[in-house]
Amino acid sequence: GGTTALYFAKELPDMKCNVFTNGIAVAQELAQKKNVTVNLLGGLLIKDNLSTASPLAAQYFADTNFELAIISASAFTPESGFSCGAQVEADLLRFVRKKAKFVYMMLDSSKIGKIMPYTFARPEDINVLITDDAFPQSLKEQFKEKDIVVM
């Protein structure tokens, strides 16, 4: 629901698809696209990134099937994995990650070396890493060694 997800929403083509988001700004951006159906999750407002999360999200998604989950993290270290600042958000991301056939992680280089309180995924839990040019080559190689596509 943060800035990385917002950049993705801006670049998403106006194509027929269903998007589930907990990001308020992401939902606003996607609402401008005629062919995109936007499902905004409710719950606790996480003020740091203007997203929402709720323990009820698991019930909401219980019968929802995801071909692809495109998620982002607030922080990453190889030791701690992908993390965020709210337990309820970590629970939501973990649940969605486990339900999806494929998981794409958006992580820009500014998040590397940072640790947030709640880990929701490890490198082996994702299929594709989407990052920026400043992402360290040595870290890219570590992902590739685990058969993770780096874009």
Please report, for each region that a protein language model flagged, where it lies by residue.
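Helix-turn-helix/homeodomain-like alpha-helical modules used for DNA recognition
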Residues: 1-14, 21
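Conserved phosphate- and dinucleotide-binding cores of soluble alpha/beta proteins
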Residues: 20, 24-151
